[in-house]
Amino acid sequence: MNAINNQVLIEVKDLHSAFGNTIIHRGVSFSVHKGEVMAILGGSGSGKSTLLRCMILLNRPTKGEVLLFGEDIWKLKEREQQKIFNRCGICFQFGALYSSLTVLENVGVMLEQYGAYSKKIVEEISKMWIEKVGLPPRAYHLYPYELSGGMKKRVGIARAMATNPEILFLDEPTSGLDPYSAGKFDELIMTLKESLQLTVVMITHDLDSVYDCVDRFIMLKDGLLEFNGDLKDFIKKAQTQGLDEGNLFNSTRGEKFWKGM
């Protein structure tokens, strides 16, 4: 893995969140550096998805700060928020593809929203990214219902990357994929990171992904940050202090991770 830059791109400070009377987070703090692949782990209901949503303006925290590129996103005006998120790509768990659009049209959606590109340029950039994520030219004119789960994930990545983001947010990127496809997806993430110095934040239950392509991960439990470090740190803490890691994951992939233990 490439060396991680010292520049902090994301900083979460003392984040609290709740739904009604149900407390989700109680003072979560961490940072993400440029060029780092960081994962958010935790058991079902631990607040992984809510944390990600707080980081991408979908859930407002009840307290605390979320800084992207040094700006507290929840204190910015809408126009300034948009400028920040023009530098980010987001790929949701099921791709969130438009069913009435072809692969080529889906990938070009964000470029068209920028309004600064001609139709020809949008098409050329879209084709480039479709091929970069490992899909053949014959996929250009397919519709989402004609794609496998793995292909949909790759289209989602192509669309998120088409605007050349500095940060990529991923929600369960290998969920629903067979082991081979999940492994190839991990390779894609590493290729993007190494070739573009991309910073990636992902929610995952996939322990092989953690082993293969994650530089560091945080672990949520009972609304708190239970762990923040790399795999070596995790192994050391599990052996010396004990961690309830066995109950945190439901993925069938994890052989490499557990061998490390």
Regions found by a protein language model. Give the residues of each.
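Conserved ABC ATPase "signature" region
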Residues: 120-138
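Conserved ABC ATPase signature
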Residues: 143-147, 151
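Catalytic Walker B motif of ABC-type/P-loop ATPase nucleotide-binding domains
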Residues: 168-171
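Conserved catalytic motifs of ABC-family nucleotide-binding domains
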Residues: 164
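H-loop/switch region of ABC-family ATPase nucleotide-binding domains
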Residues: 204-205
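Helix-to-loop junction immediately C-terminal to a conserved catalytic motif
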Residues: 56
